[in-house]
């Protein structure tokens, strides 16, 4: 079973409180979602493997450390996942980007994929799927399935808030995927929103509510 980890760093929790407030405007919401994405990436990548490399500083040659292993691809789920993207890229600017477009049927709450674009060598990369909300788990599971269909072996999921129902759905469908969240929220409401949640993260990010 993949692990579920709440990243309870004080800065993450403080910023999460700001974006939970209903009177936080789109500009501030957008900025802080990106900041949380960056802070989460710092924690998620804590155990990346390192290797020794010889470099030359202005003072002479020395052996130092750099990240080893497969290259990283960030996979935002459209549209709300875009809000976390720049913050993640601030931490790993060399990462490539794969984009998955999903929309949720307002009646059935089921996700539908309408777009997929990824680096040609996606099967050789580790992927970090990012989306602010893990509600039913449908979009996350479909995104993970789309990556696995294209040969990706190592996938992690980063979300801001997660409902217990979504956590369970992802763990049951994808027991090899680790989930990282800024918070595990109380429940999934009948309308498909997370409580206490963030509201509609996409609308709040793009000012379309």
Swiss-Prot record:
Reactions that this protein is recorded to catalyse: UMP + diphosphate = 5-phospho-alpha-D-ribose 1-diphosphate + uracil
Transcription regulation as UniProt keyword? no
- Asked if the keyword Calcium belongs to this entry, the reply reads no
| Positions with a binding annotation for uracil | 194, 199-201
Q: Name one GO biological process term.
A: UMP salvage
Known regulation of activity: Allosterically activated by GTP.
Per UniProt, what is one GO molecular function of this protein? GTP binding
Q: Its Enzyme Commission number?
A: 2.4.2.9
Q: Which UniProt keywords apply?
A: Allosteric enzyme, Glycosyltransferase, GTP-binding, Magnesium, Nucleotide-binding, Transferase
Gene3D superfamilies according to UniProt: 3.40.50.2020
Named in its record, the pathway it takes part in is: Pyrimidine metabolism; UMP biosynthesis via salvage pathway; UMP from uracil: step 1/1
Q: What does the entry list as the binding residues for 5-phospho-alpha-D-ribose 1-diphosphate?
A: 79, 104, 131-139, 200
Coiled-coil-forming residues are none
Co-factor requirement: Mg(2+)
**Cofactor comment in the record?**
Binds 1 Mg(2+) ion per subunit. The magnesium is bound as Mg-PRPP.
Job description of the protein? Catalyzes the conversion of uracil and 5-phospho-alpha-D-ribose 1-diphosphate (PRPP) to UMP and diphosphate.
- Xref: PANTHER family: ADENINE PHOSPHORIBOSYLTRANSFERASE, URACIL PHOSPHORIBOSYLTRANSFERASE, CHLOROPLASTIC
Query: So what family is this one in?
Result: Belongs to the UPRTase family.
Protein name, please? Uracil phosphoribosyltransferase
Q: Which gene encodes it?
A: upp
